[in-house]
Amino acid sequence: MGFGLRWILLVAGYVADFEGAKGYVARPSPLVLPMLSIGALWLILWQGRLRNFGPIMMAASFMIWASDDRPLVLIAENGSLLGVMTDQGRALSKEKGAGFVARNWLENDGDPSLQSVTASLWGTGMKGMKVAQVGAYEFVHLIGKKAVFEFDRCQSDQIVIASVETQRDFGNCTVHDPKTLRNSGSIGLYLQGDEAVFITARDISGDRIWSAWPSKQPSK
């Protein structure tokens, strides 16, 4: 048995080294894989004409998968990283740091690019501050204490993400920092028509006993 297992691993490692052996696909919605599995089981196990529902269900799951949209904007749960979807892929606000989060985002987008490559897609900004316009909102990522301290413009259409806790009121804009994000978790923005919809990790997981979310969600 040991020889057989070693042979399997050897062949797997050899094939995995081929160029193009590893591919990426965008993460499907939670509905897709159950539909695909049930459809396949229905096709295999059912007898008679009703087994045709199996391929129909499988085809429907692939159609849903193809039409799924990834979030236009992703905010890391501690404010350390911001990702904005562009025509060339997701632009990340940092070329290094928060590597685990960056890798998960890119893999779920179906993008094999390195973090340093996707960071080069970012448009405007300066050292310590990255700016991106998404719909009616201007997203500002402040990286480090110096950037947070020097930031002095805050407008109602801005959403500011700080990598460190803010110690002052920026004014008439929405601010997310490690303190507020502890109450919401990571945040994703979707566009439904002209309307922006923000979905938090807390919205998805719910307030369960084991989730350990704070009892209230303070806002700034």
Predicted regions and their residues:
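Transmembrane helix-bundle segments that form internal channels/tunnels in multi-pass membrane proteins
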Residues: 1-79, 83-87
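Extracytosolic and intramembrane catalytic regions of membrane-associated proteins
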Residues: 85-220
